[in-house]
């Protein structure tokens, strides 16, 4: 299955709305002006996502994982390599003594960033596509990409066959941090998403 140009444009618009809401919430929370650049979105079979992410994200990766259920089900993840997660926590923290490792303070910051970002994007899907979903409590893990994806697949309610990879860049003060949001879905949930995107596009043209 591939994204049509229209579906990619619609997804980009929806995710961008979610990013705008997340950036506003993060800016209010931290007191800093935070921007999230327009996302770049691609769809891949789950078997190819692991190797692609391993090429992009070096070594151990900080992952904030949030399962969602409802008319569509799957998992949404915010992925940052460890150095990027540390850099992001430093940019967002008033504590200049943040260690050169993901200590408890840094983990708390990254978990909250993931919670805000993932909730904003999944909430847009629910509200604008009219597909209500409920979310689990976000979970942070620091591990390799294969271990993270294996854990997600093990807990999934249906076989996860596809993933939307969403390139994410945070702009905060003088710093930029790059990561990825990945939404993994089974075939039935992906079909539902594509149908709802088409209907949303039709409503926009009315």
What is each residue range found by the language model?
Residues 1-206:
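Composition-driven recognition of glycine/serine/threonine/acidic- and proline-rich low-complexity segments
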């Amino acid at each position: 299955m591939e994204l049509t140009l229209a579906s990619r444009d619609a997804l980009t618009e929806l995710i961008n709305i979610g990013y705008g809401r997340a950036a506003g919430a993060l800016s209010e929370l931290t007191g800093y002006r935070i921007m999230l650049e327009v996302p770049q979105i691609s769809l891949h079979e789950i078997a190819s996502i692991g190797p692609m992410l391993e090429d992009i994200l070096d070594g151990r990766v900080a992952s904030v994982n949030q399962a969602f259920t409802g008319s569509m089900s799957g998992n949404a993840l915010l992925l940052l390599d460890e150095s990027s997660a540390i850099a992001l926590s430093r940019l967002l923290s008033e504590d200049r003594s943040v260690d050169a490792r993901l200590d408890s303070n840094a983990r708390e910051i990254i978990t909250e960033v993931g919670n805000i970002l993932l909730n904003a994007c999944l909430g847009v899907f629910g509200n604008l596509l009219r597909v209500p979903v409920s979310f689990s409590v976000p979970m942070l893990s620091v591990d390799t990409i294969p271990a993270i994806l294996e854990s997600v697949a093990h807990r999934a309610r249906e076989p996860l066959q596809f993933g939307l990879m969403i390139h994410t860049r945070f702009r905060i003060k003088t710093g930029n941090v790059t990561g990825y949001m990945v939404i993994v879905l089974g075939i039935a949930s992906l079909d539902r998403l594509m149908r709802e995107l088409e209907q949303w596009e039709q409503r926009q043209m009315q």
